[in-house]
Design a protein with these regions (language model features):
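Periplasmic alpha-helical coiled-coil/stalk elements that build and connect Gram-negative outer-membrane
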Residues: 69, 78, 85-200, 311, ...
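A glycine-biased, small/acidic residue-tolerant capping/turn segment at secondary-structure junctions
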Residues: 327-351, 376-391
C-alpha cells in the first residue's frame, strides 16, 4: 500500500541515482578504450585523388598508486548505503504515521460515540428540566444552563465528525489515494505487546535508519578526506594506441600497416598545491562535523526510546485510575440526579457531575490512544522493520 507514496518513491529514485554514481566510480578504476576512425581523400593539381585512413584504438589507464580512485569509489559506496538508509527511514516513518492516523481514527470514533450518547442524554435532561419548570419545580436559569450544556456537547459532536473526516483524508493522502471512507475496528479491539523492554541495548539503537545514515555519512566523510589528500600526489597514466593506417608520413602505403604506440604521463600539481591542501582541511573539518552528528544521533535515539517506554508505561498505569474515575463519576451523576429529583440538590451540581463524567470519559479514551501511540513510537524509535539490501 505504501509503494504509491510520493516520498517513498522519491527516496527510491535517490537510491537509483546513488547506485548509478557508484557504478561510475567503479568503472573509473578500469582502463578506458576509445575508437576514433579517420579517413579522407586529397588531390593535388587535378591529380588522381588519394584515399587515406586511420583506424586507431586508444587505451588509457590511470595507475591508482595513491588510492585516489579507490577512495572515491568507497566514498560513493558509503553514499549509496546512506541513500538506502534514507529510504528505510522514510518507509519506517510512513508506517508509524499510518498506524498513528489509524489509531487516531479509532480514538475519534470512540470519542464521537461518547459525545453523541451524552448529547442524547442531555437532550432528554433539557426536556425534563423544562417539564420541571412548567411544574414550578425549576427556574428559567436552570433551563438555560442545561440548554447551553447540551449545545456545547452538540458542538463537540460536530467538531469530532469534522476531525474524523480530516483524519481519513490525511490517511488517504499519505497512501496516495483519493479521499474515501477508511474501514477500521474499534479502539478496544487493538492489541499491543503486554511486555516491553526496560533498558535498550546499543545494538538495538544501531538498527535505526538515522543512526546508520549518520554512520555512513561519517564513512563518506572519511573517504572524502582520503580522496582530497590523494590529490596532493602525482597522477600516473599509461596510454597506448594500436590500429591500421595507410598514411606513413608523406607516403601512402597500400595495404595499410599496423601502427603501435605507447606513452606514460605523470601529472604533479604545483600551482594548485595550496588549493588542494585547503581542500584537505575542509574535508577534515567536515569529517569532524560528521562525527559530532553521529554522536548526537545516538544520544537522540536513546532519548526517544526511553521517552516512548515511559509514555507507554505511564499510560498503562493510568488506565486503571481512569477506569476508577469514570466509575466514580457515574455514581456521582446518578446520585446527584436522584437528589435533584427529591429537591436535595441543585441543577448546577447535576450539570457539574455530568460535565466531569464526559471529560473523564474522553480522557480515558485519549489515554488508551496514548498507549497505542507510544508503542508505535517505540517501533519507530527502534528502527522499525528492516529490508534486506544488496549493493549492486
Amino acid at each position: 500500500v505504501l509503494v504509491r507514496n510520493t516520498d517513498l518513491r522519491t527516496a527510491q529514485l535517490q537510491v537509483e541515482e546513488a547506485e548509478a554514481t557508484l557504478r561510475t566510480a567503479r568503472l573509473s578504476l578500469l582502463p578506458s578504450f576509445t575508437l576514433a576512425p579517420q579517413g579522407g581523400v586529397s588531390s593535388f593539381d587535378n591529380s588522381k585523388g588519394t584515399w587515406t585512413y586511420n583506424l586507431p584504438v586508444t587505451a588509457s589507464w590511470e595507475i591508482d598508486i595513491f588510492s585516489r580512485l579507490r577512495n572515491g569509489k568507497l566514498r560513493n559506496k558509503a553514499l549509496y548505503y546512506q541513500s538506502i538508509e534514507y529510504r528505510q527511514a522514510v518507509r519506517t516513518q510512513l508506517i508509524a504515521t499510518t498506524a498513528n492516523l489509524y489509531f487516531t481514527l479509532c480514538m475519534l470514533d470512540e470519542q464521537y460515540a461518547i459525545a453523541n450518547e451524552t448529547a442524547s442524554a442531555w437532550r432528554e435532561a433539557v426536556d425534563a428540566i423544562r417539564a420541571m419548570k412548567d411544574a414550578g419545580m425549576a427556574t428559567e436559569a436552570a433551563v438555560a444552563q442545561n440548554e447551553a450544556a447540551y449545545y456545547s456537547v452538540e458542538t463537540s459532536v460536530k467538531q469530532l465528525a469534522q476531525s474524523i473526516s480530516e483524519t481519513e483524508n490525511s490517511l488517504c493522502s499519505l497512501l496516495a489515494q483519493t479521499p474515501h471512507k477508511i474501514e477500521r475496528g474499534s479502539l478496544e479491539s487493538q492489541r499491543m505487546p503486554a511486555d516491553l523492554l526496560i533498558g535498550v541495548p546499543v545494538q538495538l539503537l544501531s538498527r535505526r535508519p538515522d543512526v546508520r545514515r549518520a554512520e555512513y555519512s561519517l564513512m563518506s566523510a572519511y573517504y572524502a578526506t582520503a580522496e582530497a589528500r590523494s590529490a596532493l600526489y602525482p597522477q600516473i597514466t599509461l596510454s597506448g594506441t594500436a590500429g591500421w593506417t595507410n598514411s606513413a608520413g608523406s607516403q601512402i602505403v597500400n595495404p595499410g600497416k599496423l601502427l603501435l604506440s605507447a606513452a606514460g604521463q605523470l601529472l604533479q600539481p604545483i600551482f594548485q598545491a595550496g588549493a588542494n591542501r585547503a581542500r584537505v582541511k575542509i574535508a577534515k573539518a567536515q569529517q569532524q562535523e560528521a562525527m559530532l552528528a553521529y554522536e548526537q544521533t545516538i544520544l537522540n535515539a536513546g532519548q526517544e526510546v526511553n521517552d516512548a517506554l515511559t509514555a507507554c508505561q505511564t499510560a498503562r498505569e493510568s488506565a486503571a485510575l481512569y477506569d476508577q474515575q469514570v466509575a466514580s463519576l457515574r455514581r456521582a451523576v446518578e446520585s446527584t440526579e436522584l437528589l435533584m429529583q427529591h429537591g436535595s440538590t441543585t441543577y448546577l451540581e447535576v450539570l457539574t457531575a455530568r460535565q466531569s463524567l464526559l471529560s473523564a470519559q474522553l480522557q480515558q479514551v485519549a489515554n488508551r490512544f496514548t498507549e497505542l501511540q507510544s508503542v508505535v513510537t517505540l517501533y519507530h524509535a527502534l528502527g522499525g522493520g528492516r529490508e534486506t539490501e544488496t549493493a549492486q
